[in-house]
């Protein structure tokens, strides 16, 4: 007697988007052509919706009974503990729970910068004696094949399982017995749940077993849930942040060496492609401010595009189309002042432009824009005037601070004893005078 996964009369499928027979339908394994095939006969070599790989990737000519397991983290091995790894299917006894996982190398796609990026592989399960390696014995060393079986299964004989006919049988969502530990860096396709990382298997097993006992008390045919962890969004977010180097807990520090590398990278670009910032200032990118380059002052010259006020100014910047079609352009050949005299001289041209950016008071942030423009237009004139009014005296090389400052000081007259406020000892004459001052005054009545 051959077994058909998901065909047990009293079985109940998990929650989700259910089709007519109560089994989830997966877009990557459903047959759109609805070609009728004979049950019990092996499906013809035909591609699934995701098997047609114009940009690389191997072909999956057979339909798996279960949804796939997708890798989302590079460098992680696909493996299960002994006796684990066979998905649960209503109507299939434990003696037939044997087979292999087949690695499907998905296609590559073209990124925005023109590079090809290969998608990480996805694994599909096939029962022993079915699928692309139906004729291979259990345990054969094959690249892209991982063999799994339950402890009750006999791996020396093929599983008595029919091939899936996509016209009548739809894929079953992959679930595992309680306590199964999924490979780290993988998630079950369509479940939004990932493998447990630090949570103990025994704890998950005890919870699952208690839940299973309650389930058996209510309904003996309820499908047990897999021992997987909650949403993997946090894990994916941490991986992305680590890949981009933007870990919020450890802000990236810019050292002198990295700042020098950033500055050199900016200066290696053509002049019209440079973007000044903290590491490469406006003056380093475009030179000093003057009549021909009259914008920028104060903090904006130090921070460049990193200045908090710059984004609102960037709203005024013309697009490439407005620059070419809305400006007066003039091509002029200029003298090449770069390079050595013994090197071959290159022809250097300047595309000079003259245009205007028009806006009115209805523009969003108009007051702020006007404030920033007034602070930065011709700001170099105010800075030069301030420097000319109070020039800082420069110290000669080799001269210590304070030395030479007393050369131009006029010599004043020496102070008196009172000004000097010096303490001296009393003489005998001084003591005699003090005693007379203490005696009472008597009027002299003697006649002359």
Swiss-Prot record:
Keywords: ADP-ribosylation, Host Golgi apparatus, Phosphoprotein, Ribonucleoprotein, RNA-binding, Transcription, Transcription regulation, Viral nucleoprotein, Virion
Recorded name of the encoding gene: N
Sequence positions bearing Phosphothreonine: 174, 427
Domain CoV N CTD: 259-384
Protein name according to UniProt: Nucleoprotein
HAMAP family attached to this UniProt entry: BETA_CORONA_NCAP
InterPro entries reported for this sequence: N_prot_C_CoV (IPR044344), N_prot_N_CoV (IPR044345), NCAP_bCoV (IPR043505), Nucleocap_CoV (IPR001218), Nucleocapsid_C (IPR037179), Nucleocapsid_N (IPR037195)
Organism whose genome encodes this protein: Bovine coronavirus (strain 98TXSF-110-LUN)
Family: Belongs to the betacoronavirus nucleocapsid protein family.
Region feature RNA-binding, mapped onto this chain: 52-194
Primary location recorded for the protein, binned into one broad class: virion
Domain CoV N NTD: 61-190
Subunit annotation: Homooligomer. Both monomeric and oligomeric forms interact with RNA. Interacts with protein M. Interacts with NSP3; this interaction serves to tether the genome to the newly translated replicase-transcriptase complex at a very early stage of infection.
Phosphoserine sites (modified residues): 167, 191, 390
Record PTM: ADP-ribosylated. The ADP-ribosylation is retained in the virion during infection. Phosphorylated on serine and threonine residues.
Presence of the UniProt keyword Protein biosynthesis in the record: no
Polar residues bias (residue ranges): 29-38, 45-55, 383-393, 399-409
GO cellular component: host cell endoplasmic reticulum-Golgi intermediate compartment; host cell Golgi apparatus; ribonucleoprotein complex; viral nucleocapsid
Keyword Coiled coil: no
Region spans: Disordered: 1-55, 158-231, 383-420
Residues that coordinate or bind RNA: 106, 122, 164
Region (Dimerization): 266-384
């Amino acid at each position: 007697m051959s077994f058909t996964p998901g065909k047990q009369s009293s079985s109940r499928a998990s929650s989700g988007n259910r089709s007519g027979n109560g089994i989830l339908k997966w877009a990557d394994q459903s047959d759109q052509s609805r070609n009728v095939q004979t049950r019990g006969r092996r499906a013809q070599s035909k591609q699934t919706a995701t098997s047609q790989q114009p940009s690389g990737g191997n072909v999956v000519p057979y339909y798996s009974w279960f949804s796939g397991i997708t890798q989302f983290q590079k460098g992680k091995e696909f493996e299960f503990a002994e006796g684990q790894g066979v998905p649960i299917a209503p109507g299939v006894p434990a003696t037939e729970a044997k087979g292999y996982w087949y690695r499907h190398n998905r296609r590559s796609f073209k990124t925005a910068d023109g590079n090809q990026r290969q998608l990480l592989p996805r694994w599909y399960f096939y029962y022993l004696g079915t699928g692309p390696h139906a004729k291979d014995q259990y345990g054969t060393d094959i690249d892209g094949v991982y063999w799994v079986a339950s402890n009750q299964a006999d791996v020396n004989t093929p599983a008595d399982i029919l091939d899936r006919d996509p016209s009548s049988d739809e894929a079953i969502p992959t679930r595992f017995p309680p306590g199964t530990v999924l490979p780290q860096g993988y998630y079950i396709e369509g479940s939004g749940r990932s493998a447990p990382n630090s949570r103990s298997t025994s704890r998950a097993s005890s919870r699952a077993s208690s839940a299973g006992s309650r389930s058996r008390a209510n309904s003996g045919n309820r499908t047990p849930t897999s021992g997987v962890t909650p949403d993997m969004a946090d894990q994916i977010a941490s991986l992305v942040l680590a890949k981009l180097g933007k870990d919020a807990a450890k802000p990236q520090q810019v050292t002198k060496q990295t700042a020098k590398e950033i500055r050199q990278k900016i200066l290696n670009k053509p002049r019209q492609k440079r973007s000044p910032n903290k590491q490469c200032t406006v003056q380093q990118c475009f030179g000093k401010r003057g009549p021909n380059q009259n914008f920028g002052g104060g903090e904006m010259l130090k921070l460049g595009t990193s200045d908090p006020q710059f984004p609102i100014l960037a709203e005024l910047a013309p697009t490439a189309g407005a620059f070419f079609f809305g400006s007066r352009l003039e091509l002029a050949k200029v003298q090449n002042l770069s390079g050595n005299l013994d090197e071959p001289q290159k022809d250097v041209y300047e595309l000079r432009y003259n245009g205007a950016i028009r806006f009115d008071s209805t523009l969003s942030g108009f007051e702020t824009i006007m404030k920033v423009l007034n602070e930065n237009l011709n700001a170099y004139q105010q800075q030069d005037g301030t420097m000319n009014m109070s020039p800082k005296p420069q110290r000669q090389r080799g001269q210590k601070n304070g030395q030479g400052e007393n050369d131009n000081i006029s010599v004043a007259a020496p102070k008196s004893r009172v000004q000097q406020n010096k303490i001296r000892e009393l003489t005998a004459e001084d003591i005699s005078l003090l005693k007379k001052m203490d005696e009472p005054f008597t009027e002299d009545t003697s006649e002359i």
